Design a protein with these regions (language model features):
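Residue-level detection of the helix-turn-helix DNA-binding "recognition helix"
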Residues: 23, 37, 48, 79
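Short C-terminal boundary/hinge segments that cap the last helix of small helical domains
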Residues: 68-83
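Recognition helix of helix-turn-helix/homeodomain-like DNA-binding domains
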Residues: 38-53
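A short, Lys/Arg-rich alpha-helix, primarily the initiator
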Residues: 1-28
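Short, basic-rich loop-to-helix N-cap that marks the start of a DNA-contacting helix
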Residues: 50-62
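Short alpha-helical "recognition helix" segments of helix-turn-helix
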Residues: 32-33
Length: 85
């Protein structure tokens, strides 16, 4: 039996689009931090789409609850080879 493993080094990435949602709703990072009970630095990392190794689902749930949005509104999957335009 020939077992082989397929390794895909390029699988795309997840982009945090929290800034877009916040800007549309006219809410500041300070205001969102106060409403969610999260520290400003956490909100700011998501707002700036800063490199993070994992998304905290509790943080994401609080943000979506306060902004009355879906996770798909603040996270976008970008396939490999596609450039953001």
């Amino acid at each position: 039996m020939n077992d082989s493993i397929f390794v895909c080094k390029e699988y795309g990435r997840v982009i945090i689009t929290l800034k877009d949602v916040m800007d549309k709703q006219g809410i500041t990072r300070n205001r969102l931090a106060n409403l969610t009970g999260l520290v400003y630095n956490s909100i700011n990392r998501y707002y700036q789409n800063a490199p993070i190794s994992s998304v905290d689902l509790d943080v994401l749930a609080k943000i979506c609850f306060v902004l009355n949005c879906e996770t798909a509104d603040v996270l976008k999957y970008e396939r490999p080879g596609i450039t953001q335009g």
